[in-house]
Regions:
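ATP/Mg2+-dependent ligation/transfer catalytic cores
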Residues: 1-195
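Active-site-proximal, well-structured secondary-structure segments within enzyme catalytic domains
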Residues: 195-202
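Conserved small/polar residues in nucleotide/adenosyl-binding loops
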Residues: 203-207
Length: 207
């Protein structure tokens, strides 16, 4: 992976920090910030995180039975191939991202890692000469800023609760600055981008 790092650092000279992240059982990203000079060592040797980091509750708190019963031993987080990507921030592309997956001390997949569980499921399909295909849709709501020290409820009360104007292009144009930034973020990380539509609710958008 040395060539991968060299090409990345050359293409993004402003990157000073990398998010080395792994996804826990709730789909929340956990991990460490890694300085630019440590990227190669992380790709070569991985990094340690407690195995219990993948079993936190949704609030990020330890589950005592997981964290303390075995002394909260470490797992080894190894880089997922081709996952070193730039991250678009308000300052530009001055940050990177590296997706990790956890193995145990023998190098075997740690089955508390959702990514490893999914890999095992895919193995079953492969053994049957099957290839699952899927499409992901990101749905979200855009809410007015209620202002400092004001409850969000005030913004909701001001909205037209009837909604409507389904698939309206002018509604997308109204939020074009934010939606253009979203599109650029997808492009920066080489993520598939098929388009955006306005849903039925006044503030409901789908990508």
């Amino acid at each position: 992976m040395q060539r991968e790092v060299e090409l990345f650092l050359k293409a993004y000279p402003s990157v000073e920090m990398i998010e080395a992240l792994i996804t826990d059982c709730n789909g929340v990203a956990r991990g460490k910030w890694i300085p630019r000079g440590k990227i190669q060592s992380i790709l070569d040797d991985g990094l340690k995180l407690p195995k219990s980091a993948l079993g936190l509750d949704i609030w990020g708190r330890d589950i005592p039975e997981l964290a303390h019963a075995n002394g909260d031993i470490d797992g080894y987080c190894m880089a997922v191939e081709d996952s070193l990507k730039p991250v678009l921030t308000p300052r530009g592309t001055d940050q990177g991202q590296l997706i990790m997956t956890m193995v145990d001390e023998t190098g075997a997949p740690y089955m508390g890692d959702p990514r490893q569980i999914l890999a095992k499921v895919l193995e079953g399909f492969s053994e049957r000469n099957l290839k699952p295909c899927m499409a992901a849709e990101l749905e979200f709501y855009l809410l007015p800023d209620p202002g400092r020290d004001k409850p969000l409820r005030e913004s909701l009360d001001s909205l037209d609760t009837l909604g409507g104007n389904l698939y309206a292009l002018n509604e997308l144009d109204h939020h074009s600055e934010m939606l253009d930034l979203l599109r650029e973020t997808f492009k920066t990380q080489d993520l598939p981008y098929e388009g955006i539509i306005k849903e039925l609710s006044l503030i409901h958008i789908s990508e």
